[in-house]
From Swiss-Prot:
<dbReference type="GO" id="GO:0006583">
    <property type="term" value="P:melanin biosynthetic process from tyrosine"/>
</dbReference>
<dbReference type="GO" id="GO:0048067">
    <property type="term" value="P:cuticle pigmentation"/>
</dbReference>
<dbReference type="InterPro" id="IPR036736">
    <property type="entry name" value="ACP-like_sf"/>
</dbReference>
<comment type="function">
    <text>Nonribosomal peptide synthase which is required for the regulation of histamine and dopamine levels in various tissues through their condensation with beta-alanine. In epithelial glial cells, plays an essential role in the inactivation of histamine, the main neurotransmitter in the optical nerve system, by catalyzing the conversion of histamine into carcinine. In the cuticle, catalyzes the condensation of beta-alanine with dopamine to form beta-alanyl-dopamine (NBAD), a metabolite involved in the pigmentation and sclerotization of the insect cuticle.</text>
</comment>
<dbReference type="GO" id="GO:0042440">
    <property type="term" value="P:pigment metabolic process"/>
</dbReference>
<dbReference type="GO" id="GO:0003833">
    <property type="term" value="F:beta-alanyl amine synthase activity"/>
</dbReference>
<dbReference type="GO" id="GO:0048066">
    <property type="term" value="P:developmental pigmentation"/>
</dbReference>
<dbReference type="GO" id="GO:0042417">
    <property type="term" value="P:dopamine metabolic process"/>
</dbReference>
<feature type="region of interest" description="Adenylation">
    <location>
        <begin position="26"/>
        <end position="540"/>
    </location>
</feature>
<feature type="binding site">
    <location>
        <position position="825"/>
    </location>
    <ligand>
        <name>beta-alanine</name>
    </ligand>
</feature>
<keyword id="KW-0436">Ligase</keyword>
<feature type="region of interest" description="Condensation">
    <location>
        <begin position="666"/>
        <end position="679"/>
    </location>
</feature>
<dbReference type="Pfam" id="PF00550">
    <property type="entry name" value="PP-binding"/>
</dbReference>
<dbReference type="Pfam" id="PF00501">
    <property type="entry name" value="AMP-binding"/>
</dbReference>
<dbReference type="GO" id="GO:0043042">
    <property type="term" value="P:amino acid adenylylation by nonribosomal peptide synthase"/>
</dbReference>
<dbReference type="InterPro" id="IPR045851">
    <property type="entry name" value="AMP-bd_C_sf"/>
</dbReference>
<dbReference type="GO" id="GO:0007593">
    <property type="term" value="P:chitin-based cuticle sclerotization"/>
</dbReference>
Length: 879
């Protein structure tokens, strides 16, 4: 007898729920915690050592009450009416500040809903929002021109709080509020619309409360958790739980200025200072922070952000590789990473998944989006609204208490449907997400979009909206807008444009400047002007060909005829080497898509830089020996300032012995390898190659730590006898911090390798053997083979570079002293490849690692990226 098929319907836990107005919950907290700190704010421009401003729960509540009374009076006094949905909306155009949070609370207390307008929004977007949502008032920062709001009444924050100063500070009674306190909608957030026009999502108090109650039950605040952080843009739905979750539980909120959020160095310092224990962020910011943490704090005894134990990723797809790299830095079982899925229409989150370990993540091709939140149900439906079977792909629909009330002016009613599958009243409505999903082993997997929407830095962007704005430019004949590598590090919105035949000369950057007046920053595409639009046989646009065009132009290893333009004319003579290092590094990171000359006056971000590749650029500069901080790099107005900082902080790497030590506190001395060094050398090599090796990472989990020690134990006595290897002592601590292992290439011992490391050694022989046997000097004492070099795990990046430089110089000294003809080595690490360039090694082979075919026909390094290379180098020691 057959069994019934399991259908893709997943129900969250059922929690008791009593609808309440959110500001009333805050008022209860104020009674319990009147004198506790509620708000902490330190402007990004505040001088060093100055105390941040703080407000207690009582102060915040009374100030909000007075402001609320003024808002009610202004509304009645100006005879202002609710909009067509019956909502009293107050738009807020303010930067993150202490006053911003109090103003939002005041709007609720007055009986209104707040609608955030980012100060950076272009005029046409603001105009559309005001025209459609019809807010009664706009509250703005003092320095924002009231004329931007085109006739809608405005109040500056100074006016709001000055005029309300004499009003009562007690809580408002329901009858004092707009609509007698029958406030239903709490927040209106504008998102990208499928028709190319932004639409406002109406979020009720009860939906927000259900989302918060699930959070409080699932991730309760601990006794030692005093401060939480508010750093997400107010226009982004994740700001709701980030801001109001802690304030309705008696915690303090640390308001982070935008400038700090964009600077990993300052953000990490702030999170450390206040011992923040949880953080909500988009995967892009997580990647930036992990890069920074590994660069700055990976070797510290107490890791940076160790106190931050709950990490929530939301707003973009979370890749398995990024989630795994989280556990490369943080501890499994101590630190937790969560993948949240949703949209503004479901309060940002309707499902979640807990990432627990690298082993767990290795079971997935993509990180699941998990299971539903409390009081919600997720359905995967086919085109006829019938649940699909487990494992099949269906469109994701959500129902329950997390749903929005709909859109402003009742737009797009087809997105909110009557639920034919509902039994209980709270599940009577369905929201159509426009995403595909499948149910596998109890978890929902994200399977892509049904339309042209993508997530950019956590913001939902409909490509049709971008395309509509591009097509409206007067010179454009045809526009096609696509997203390159959606959800990945190099994600980009691209506008492929064919100009009208009669169009005058115009550059891509000029067109982008025009679009910045029409679109938000995160929506502004990179323009690519085409001579003709490629078509498929059926006459449709060949979108893959367009993406390939962009990819080819951005591939640094691709068309060698594409040359980046560097202008050194304004660089002082003594800084030209430094400038060359910077320009080449920036060009390599940003790629050939930059259409501007790299010159001292160039701005990194205008060239195409962003927060993620700024960290990568600094990492590469540090590998070249330049000690420049992330904050210094980000704050620089142009490349000229960066050149000066690079030169001031650390001169370009020199080969002279007195300049080798990039860390003055390290006093290094090379000592020939001795028998008693065995364990320390093994520890260093194992740590260097097991944890950081560029080839072995693709063979895990098959490679063990003991595999390295077995090989070294086998050859140890020979290494010592040959007297070509050495260790490096830090004479301040009398500890070994590095080791270089060398052999005569014509007199190497045979080793019986039974582990998976045999693949690595066979690959190295594949690269080196033909060159060594056919092109290098014959006989003994001719080729010094530098085959292993490692540094102590405790060294920070600067110390690591200094030690590597010292060892490279010492290998040269050994080769000369022992009268070898030259040094032979294969470098698989970007750092040692850079050092080989510095020491003028000759490249004999540059091999793409993922193309190696093993003797059994497999490609053991097939998952390596195309840019990972193994470079065989040779240096004649007399040169």
């Amino acid at each position: 007898m057959g069994s019934l098929p399991q259908l893709s319907i997943v129900k969250g836990l059922q929690q008791d729920f009593v609808p309440r107005a959110l500001h009333r919950i805050f008022e209860e907290q104020q009674l319990r915690h009147a004198d506790k700190v509620a708000l902490i704010y330190q402007p990004s421009t505040t001088g060093q050592g100055m105390a941040p401003s703080q407000s207690s729960y009582r102060q915040m509540n009374e100030r909000a009450n007075r402001a609320a009374r003024l808002l009610v009076a202004e509304t009645h006094g100006r005879f202002l009416q609710p909009n067509s949905d019956g909502d009293f909306i107050v738009a807020v155009c303010m930067q993150p500040s202490e006053g911003l949070v109090t103003t939002l609370l005041a709007i609720w207390k007055a009986g209104g809903a707040y609608l955030p307008i980012d100060p950076s929004f272009p005029a046409n977007r603001i105009h559309h929002i005001l025209l459609e949502a019809k807010p009664t008032l706009v509250i703005r920062d003092d320095d924002i021109d009231a004329g931007r709001f085109q006739g809608t009444p405005t109040l500056s924050t100074t006016e709001l709080y000055a005029k309300s100063l004499q009003l009562a500070g007690s809580n408002l009674l329901s009858e004092e509020m707009l609509r007698g306190g029958n406030d239903h909608i709490a927040i209106v957030l504008y998102t990208s619309g499928s028709t190319g026009v932004p639409k406002g999502v109406r979020l009720p108090h009860e939906s927000i409360l259900n989302r918060l109650q699930w959070q409080w039950a699932t991730f309760p605040y601990t006794a030692n958790e005093a401060v939480s952080v508010f750093k997400t843009a107010l226009t982004f739905v994740d700001s709701i739980a980030e801001l109001w979750g802690p304030l309705m539980c008696g915690l303090a909120i640390l308001v982070v200025p935008k400038a700090v959020t964009k600077d990993p160095q300052r953000l990490v310092a702030l999170l450390e200072r206040y011992k923040i224990r949880r953080l909500v962020l988009v995967p892009t910011l997580l990647r930036s922070l992990l890069m920074y943490l590994k660069m700055e704090g990976g070797g510290a005894a107490q890791k940076l952000l160790y106190n931050l134990q709950i990490w929530v990723c939301s707003g973009e797809p979370l890749s398995v590789s990024l989630a795994s790299s989280f556990f490369d830095y943080f501890d499994e079982g101590v630190h937790r990473l969560y993948n949240f899925y949703g949209s503004t229409e479901v309060l940002g989150d309707v499902t979640y998944f807990a990432c627990e370990s690298k082993k767990q993540l290795s079971l997935y091709d993509n990180v699941p989006i998990g299971i539903p939140l409390s009081n919600t149900v997720v359905y995967l439906l086919d085109a006829d609204y019938r649940p699909v079977k487990n494992g099949e792909i269906g469109e994701i629909f959500a129902s329950g208490l997390n749903l929005a009330a709909g859109y402003v002016n009742g737009r797009d009613p087809e997105r909110f449907l009557e639920n034919p599958l509902a039994v209980e009243k709270k599940y009577a409505r369905l929201y159509r997400t426009g995403d595909y999903g499948s149910l596998k082993n109890g978890s929902i997997m994200y399977e892509g979009r049904t339309d042209s929407q993508v997530k950019i830095r956590g913001h939902r962007v409909d490509l049709s909206e971008v395309e509509k704005n591009v097509a409206e430019l007067p010179l454009v004949d045809k526009a096609i807008v696509l997203c390159y590598h959606a959800g990945q590090v190099d994600q980009a919105i691209l506008a492929f444009v064919k100009l009208r035949d009669d169009a005058p000369m115009v550059t891509e950057m000029q067109m982008e400047a025009r679009l910045k007046d029409k679109l938000a920053d995160y929506m502004t595409p990179q323009v690519v002007i085409l001579e003709h639009v490629p078509l498929l046989v059926n006459g449709k646009v060949d979108r893959q060909a367009l993406l390939k065009t962009y990819e080819t132009a951005n591939n640094n290893e691709g068309d060698s005829s594409i040359v980046l333009d560097f202008d050194y004319s304004q660089v002082p003579e003594d800084l030209k080497l430094t400038a060359r290092d910077l320009f080449e590094t920036v060009g390599g990171v940003i790629g050939r898509s930059t259409r501007a000359t790299l010159a001292p006056h160039s701005n990194f971000y205008e060239l195409g830089g962003n927060s993620l590749n700024s960290i990568f650029t600094v990492t590469l500069l540090r590998e070249k020996g330049y000690n420049i901080g992330i904050s210094e790099f980000i704050a620089a107005k142009n490349l000229g300032e960066i050149i000066e900082k690079m030169a001031a902080n650390h001169d370009a790497v020199q080969l002279e012995e007195e300049s080798l030590n990039a860390c003055p506190h390290l006093k290094m001395e090379a000592v020939p390898l001795r028998l008693e060094h065995r364990q320390e050398v093994i520890d260093i090599i194992v740590a260097s190659f097991y944890n950081k090796a560029d080839l072995e990472q693709w063979l895990k989990p098959g490679v063990l730590r003991t595999d390295y020690s077995d090989i070294l134990n086998d050859i140890w006595n020979v290494l010592v006898e040959r007297d070509l290897s050495f260790v490096v002592y830090d004479t301040n601590t009398d500890r070994i911090i590095g080791t270089a292992l060398n052999f005569d290439a014509r007199n190497e011992p045979e080793v019986d390798i039974k582990s998976k490391l045999l693949i690595v050694f066979e690959f190295l022989e594949f690269c080196e053997g033909p060159i060594r046997d056919n092109y290098l000097p014959k006989g003994l004492n001719q080729i010094l083979h530098s085959f292993m070099m490692g540094t102590a795990e405790k060294l920070n990046p600067r110390e690591n570079i200094a030690c590597m430089h010292f060892m490279e110089h010492e290998v040269l000294r050994v080769a000369r002293e022992k009268q070898f003809a030259g040094i032979f080595t294969t470098n698989t690490s970007p750092l040692t490849q850079q050092l080989a360039d510095v020491y003028h090694y000759k490249t004999l082979l540059n091999f793409q690692v993922n193309e190696y075919v093993h003797s059994d026909g497999s490609r053991p390094f097939g998952d390596a990226p195309d840019e990972q290379r193994a470079i065989v180098h040779w240096k004649e020691v007399g040169k």
